[in-house]
Regions:
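Membrane-embedded alpha-helical bundles of multi-pass transporters
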Residues: 17-20
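Catalytic domains that recognize anionic headgroups
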Residues: 3, 11-13, 24-124, 129-511
């Protein structure tokens, strides 16, 4: 081809950095405008230096990875991934840290499909695929005549970046320290630095994870007396339900009418926090012996958890799945998936209506050789396709947001749709309790809690997965309820009145 852009490596890296800051980071600049307005205090200095500061940082980072031949793959890849990441940040206010990368890696095809909306595809094609194609087609790198000259020019560019950062630190350190301290986690929204750094950390975690399974609780054993009635404990792990919209917690709407109708039989815990803000963190955390402060995903993946110990103690264990996987918590026990028996017209790729978790549950309880713990992992209020989580009969609050492009919906319609998912979760829990009430041959109990909460547009944030230190309460404050049959209370020595008093007065968490 006759006409091509002959650019030096420094020019290409600088051009890419400018493009990324201008196109992929519009959300970041809008955030700055809202939280550090130009006319307030010394924010003018922040605005004057921030573009140069970020440009220098990105230039330095890309210089480290821009090498002959490699750049033909690396730059187009950064453009396409940057386009996808920037769309998530712009439309869903997503924070890309190692936990989010892990969450993406563990996303099943059904969840991924829900993101393939026309606007997403269009944005990636326009700002990622097209520039990548033009780069491959039109740009030719003009290297220096001598290898040491090329390295010298590259080092000079990196030195200039370091100098810019040093000058900014010398003149505006206080402004930067204040801005980033008051807006913790915003660095996870600067593209492509966010997903590059998070991917490096994730890769390190994967490397660090190569170790054998550690057994714990080797002395675990049952202590039931001979002739005691069989007990079953149903553990319902919810998905994305937040305490703020939970009727039993005093929400303005009655989103839990069926549980409320059970009166004092149901014990509600109004102050409960999750271990994480994403399923990939919360589920393995709550079944491990670690608490939130010292939780390590690699350690959890290579150490036995609660279900392993129960199984070793000769307690029947089973996991019924409707949310894309147990994240390792059920790997070594019996586990089944609701997709195997639920009607296809009552399922989407991410999951089925949660009521189908009860199919065959009574038969399973009857067949237990002794005491048992059965986990029901629900899809609950999983977004962004909230409207697909419940049957038409539970479309009580209208109008609804019947799309996965939730940021385009009227906020009240979005809340209506979400509240309908909570209403359906209430129904599923009530039906599970009814099943247990009807079985007079077994002492039974049910314990429900959500894995984490959800943002519904508060402060422009949607979905979940925010870094815990800056996560809003909507993502960490979760509902929790407990129910037990009279026989369970009697034979387990559990004091219902005492439990209810503690539930209303104390704070609890997954760990």
């Amino acid at each position: 081809m006759r006409w091509r852009l002959n650019l030096s490596s420094n020019q290409i890296v600088l051009a890419f950095s400018v493009f990324a800051l201008a196109v992929f980071n519009s959300h970041y600049w809008q955030y700055m405008a809202a939280h550090a307005p130009f006319g307030e205090g010394h924010n003018w200095l922040l605005w004057l230096t921030m573009p140069f500061f970020l440009l220098a940082c990105l230039n330095f980072l890309i210089q480290l990875t821009f090498w002959p031949y490699v750049h033909k793959v690396w730059i187009p890849l950064l453009l396409v991934l940057g386009a996808g990441a920037s769309y998530a940040v712009m439309t869903q206010n997503i924070y890309f840290n190692a936990d989010m990368i892990q969450n993406i890696i563990q996303t099943n095809p059904g969840e991924a499909k829900s993101w393939l909306a026309p606007r997403f595809v269009g944005w990636v094609l326009l700002t990622g695929v097209l520039p990548a194609a033009l780069y491959l087609w039109l740009v030719r790198v003009r290297y220096a005549k001598r290898w040491y000259q090329e390295i010298g020019w590259r080092l000079a560019s990196m030195a200039a970046s370091v100098l810019v950062v040093a000058l900014v630190a010398a003149t505006a350190y206080g402004n930067y320290a204040s801005f980033f301290r008051n807006n913790k986690g915003i660095n996870h929204q600067i593209t492509p630095v966010n997903f590059i750094g998070a991917s490096i950390k994730t890769a390190y975690n994967v490397y660090d994870a190569n170790r054998p399974l550690v057994q714990i609780g080797l002395d675990a054993k049952r202590t039931s007396a001979q002739g005691e009635r069989k007990k079953v404990f149903i553990l319902v792990v919810g998905e994305t339900t937040r305490a703020e919209n939970w009727g039993l917690n005093g929400y303005a709407r009655q989103t839990t009418p069926q549980l409320a109708a059970l009166g004092s039989e149901v014990i509600n815990f109004p102050q409960v926090s999750s271990c994480g803000t994403a399923t990939a963190i919360s589920v393995p955390c709550l079944f491990s012996r670690m608490n939130r402060g010292d939780y390590n995903g690699n350690r959890a993946a290579h150490e036995e958890g609660l279900m392993d110990i129960l199984q070793r103690a000769d307690i029947y264990t089973s996991w019924r799945e409707n949310d894309g996987g147990c994240k390792g918590a059920c790997d070594r026990i019996k586990h089944v998936n609701v997709h195997d028996w639920a009607p296809k017209n009552e399922c989407v790729s991410e999951g089925c209506w949660d009521i189908h978790l009860l199919t065959g549950l009574q038969r399973e309880i009857d067949a237990m050789p002794g005491d048992g713990v059965i986990v029901l992992h629900t899809i609950g209020s999983h977004g962004p396709s909230y409207y697909q989580r419940y049957p038409q009969a539970f479309r009580k609050f209208t109008p609804t947001c019947d799309t996965n492009q939730i940021q385009q919906c009227d906020r009240q319609a979005l809340i209506n749709t979400y509240d309908n998912t909570v209403l359906y979760a209430d129904h599923v829990l009530a039906e599970t309790i009814k099943l247990l009430q009807n079985d007079t041959q077994v002492d039974s109990a049910l314990w429900y809690f959500s894995d984490h909460g959800e943002s519904l547009g508060e402060k422009g944030m949607y979905l979940h997965g925010a870094p815990y230190m800056i996560a809003p309460s909507q993502q960490t404050h979760i509902p929790m309820v407990f129910w037990a049959s009279p026989g369970f209370y009697q034979h387990s020595g559990l004091n219902q009145t005492c439990l209810r008093d503690h539930a209303g007065q104390q704070t609890y968490s997954h760990d």
